[in-house]
Swiss-Prot record:
The keyword Transmembrane helix applies. One of its GO terms (cellular component) is mitochondrial inner membrane. The gene is TMEM14C. It is found in: Mitochondrion membrane. Its main location: mitochondrion. This is Transmembrane protein 14C. The chain crosses the membrane at residues 7-27, 32-52, 62-82, 88-108.
């Protein structure tokens, strides 16, 4: 794997983000009995984990991770906008937006 110049490789942030998303779905199920929250959390957490794994193998392979975090940023951003509640929509929207920004910056900073 080539050095990208960052202190922590991008995929480690991706694995943490995937764990956050999946655990959010599990917590939503445990606290409120929400099966859709569990299903969405596990689906998007798994996709984010797959994207992070792909990043660990090839730092240029960002598309699954970018699509997953971008989709979650949009969905949870709209939920946060309409509800005004930081938990869980605002937290996931913010984390997703940060991941989109981090991937975007890494795409523009890498050698072509």
């Amino acid at each position: 794997m080539q050095d990208t110049g960052s202190v922590v490789p991008l995929h480690w942030f991706g694995f943490g983000y995937a764990a956050l998303v999946a655990s959010g779905g599990i917590i939503g199920y445990v606290k409120a009995g929400s099966v859709p929250s569990l299903a969405a959390g596990l689906l998007f957490g798994s996709l984010a984990g797959l994207g992070a794994y792909q990043l660990s193998q090839d730092p240029r392979n960002v598309w699954v991770f970018l699509a997953t975090s971008g989709t979650l940023a949009g969905i949870m951003g709209m939920r946060f906008y309409h509800s005004g509640k930081f938990m869980p929509a605002g937290l996931i929207a913010g984390a997703s937006l940060l991941m989109v920004a981090k991937v975007g910056v890494s795409m523009f900073n890498r050698p072509h």
